[in-house]
Amino acid sequence: MWAANKEKSNPLSSRQEVVASLNALLQALDTQFPANRSRFSLGDTCAHYTADIAQMEGLSRALWGLFPLMASGESTPFSEKYLTAIKLGTDPQSTGYWGETGPYDQRLVEMAAYGLGLALLGDKLTAHFTGREVMNLHAWLNQITDAQMPDSNWNYFAIMVQLGFKRAGLPYDQAAIDHRFALMDAYYLGDGWYSDGPGRPKDYYISMAFHFYGLIYATLSDDEARAKVLRERSRLFAEDFIYWSAADGASVPDRKSVV
């Protein structure tokens, strides 16, 4: 309870405070994370996929904080345990293997975090892996290239993986990147807004996915023409989206936010 109250009092107003919050989160997760495992359990809540996939999801979400921290050059006592988990999870000979993905698979969603890690860290990440382990990582992530998935913000997960491959000097598929962007351009509505797929509504995924991943791509890719478009769309979107939240943090309830 003390730790929870301490985190609630963290104003997150500086980089140091954000790092402190991340380390507190990683420390709390570590109590649920056995050594030499490729997943961990955070409870038995219901999802539309198996417990093994949910446990892989739990591990993967922590990487959205850990990989940027590692890219900054800061050390953390938790890095090695996560790197070991990735090696085990992507090794088809390991009992901890994350498995082959299927259509509309939640594991495809989680691959974006690994794409980010490769994009930010490049060979600083792959240096922790043997040649065989790098091949395993590439092969497991590469399942997303031709995967059957919703035509929606999910397209960005495939883009993030290819961006990671490219930045890390691994084989990548530029045609796959172009194809995914073309799909999303088909439901760009103007003024920075997309629908979350053909004929679907506008919702918080426009901010949390389309523009979030779009700005990562614009920053880390060498695709200057597309980066310019993505930045301009984000700028236009922000002029409207700012009114979805009040000064005290209250936001417009919409779709998943009301569940």
Each model region followed by its residue ranges:
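Membrane helical hairpin/interfacial module
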Residues: 46-128
